[in-house]
Amino acid sequence: LLAIGGYRGVITFVSLFFNIAVFSISIILMSWGWDPVIVTFASCLIIAYITLFFQNGRNSKTFASFFAVLAVLLLLFALSYFMGYGAHLRGVNEIMKYEEEIARLSPDISINMAKIAVSMIITGLIGAAMDASIAVSSAVYEVYNNNRNLSLADLFMSGIHIGGDILGATVNTLYFACLGESLTLFILFRNYHYSVLEVINSKAFCQEFVDIVISCISCILVIPLTAFAISYILKNLNRFEKYLPDDDLFIELDELREGKH
C-alpha cells in the first residue's frame, strides 16, 4: 500500500483497522442483546464516515457520497425488513456453513435471527454502495472542474451516464461474489437433483437471492442520488464552503482571494 498508494495507501490501511474495530464492537453489542438492526445501521454509518471522510478528506465528493449512502441505507432498511420477514429469512445459510465448527455448541444464542438476516444484507451492500457513489461523485467533480459553466441539469445527466457505465460492472461484481460464496450450495442442489421449484423455495437460496437483489437495488438508487447531491453542491459552493475544508475548489478560491489582497 505504501509503495503504490503512498500517504493515501497508509490512510487506507489505518481506516481498514478502524472499520474492523467498529465491526467487532457491533458484534459484541449484538451478543449483549442490543437490537441487531439498530447496531448495524449505526455501524454502517460510522464505517461510511471513516471510509469517506477519514480516508478521502471532507470535500464535495465525500460529502455528496455520504448523504447518498445515508439515504440508500434508510430506504433499504425498510425494504430489507419487508423482504427479510416476507421471505422468512433466519440466517440459516450462515449457520449451516459452519455446522462442523458449532456442532458441539448450543444454537440458542438468544438473538432474533430474522434481524440478523437483515443486518447481514445491509452489511453486505454498504461497500458496493460506497464504491459506486464515490466513483460517480469523483467523475462529476472532474467534469465540473474542467467546465464550470455546466448547469445543474447537465452535471446531473453526466452523473447518470457515468453511473450507467459503472452499474453493469458493479452488479456483475455483486452477482459473482454471491455466486462464488454459494458455489457449494449449488453443487449440493445439483447432486441431490433439486427441481427449480425446490431450489427457489430453499431458505439458503432465498437468502442469497435477497442479498443480491437488495445489493443491486442499493447500487441503482445510489447513482442518481449521488449525481444530484454532487451536482447541487458544486452549483451552490458558497453554501457548503464551511463544511468542506479539504476541497481543492475552496483551496483554489482562498488562494485567489489572498492574491487579490
Q: Locations of the language-model features?
A:
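Hydrophobic alpha-helical transmembrane segments of membrane transport and translocation systems
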Residues: A3, Y7, R190-H261
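Pore-lining and gate-forming transmembrane alpha-helices of multi-pass membrane transport proteins
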Residues: A68-V69, P107, I111, K115, ...
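Hydrophobic transmembrane alpha-helical segments of multi-pass transport and channel proteins
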Residues: L74, A78, A128-A132, I166-V171, ...
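Alpha-helical transmembrane segments of helical membrane proteins, especially in multi-pass transport
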Residues: T123, G127-A128, H161-R190
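Helix-loop junctions and hydrophobic alpha-helical segments within the transmembrane domains
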Residues: L152-G164
